[in-house]
């Protein structure tokens, strides 16, 4: 993307600069097991607002429509962020850490944050 800067001192001077846009980041959570549905519900009540307050956009969540390879029917959550740094900051935020404390051992899961190509 190009941005145009207009120089007000020299009415005819334009400066073109290339705007660099950071690649988006995707947070992928997979749940291997839910050990305590009450703890998971408490986590979900806190985690959603904590993440959206930090720029998260929930793209998909739930059981897979179709599985291949190992065929594991794991609950999966896909969240988009504007950057890896934003996703990491959301994870490390006090509000999300409170959600993790509420979850405790209520689920066996994995979170991955990846940068878009």
Locate predicted features.
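Short S/T/G/P-rich N-terminal loop/turn motif that feeds into the first structured element of a domain
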Residues: 6-75, 81-92, 115-117
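Short hydrophobic/aromatic beta-strand or adjacent loop that forms the aromatic wall/cage
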Residues: 74-76, 109-110
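C-terminal structural segments of small proteins and small subunits
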Residues: 87-112
């Amino acid at each position: 993307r190009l941005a145009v800067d207009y120089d007000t001192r020299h009415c005819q001077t334009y400066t073109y600069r290339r705007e660099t846009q950071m690649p988006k980041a995707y947070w992928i959570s997979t749940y291997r097991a839910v050990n305590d549905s009450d703890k998971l519900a408490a986590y979900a009540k806190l985690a959603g607002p904590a993440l959206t307050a930090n720029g998260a956009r929930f793209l998909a969540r739930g059981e897979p429509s179709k599985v291949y390879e190992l065929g594991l029917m794991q609950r999966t959550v896909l969240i988009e962020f504007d950057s890896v740094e934003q996703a990491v900051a959301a994870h490390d935020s006090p509000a999300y850490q409170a959600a993790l404390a509420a979850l405790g051992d209520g689920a066996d899961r994995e979170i991955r944050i990846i940068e878009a190509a």
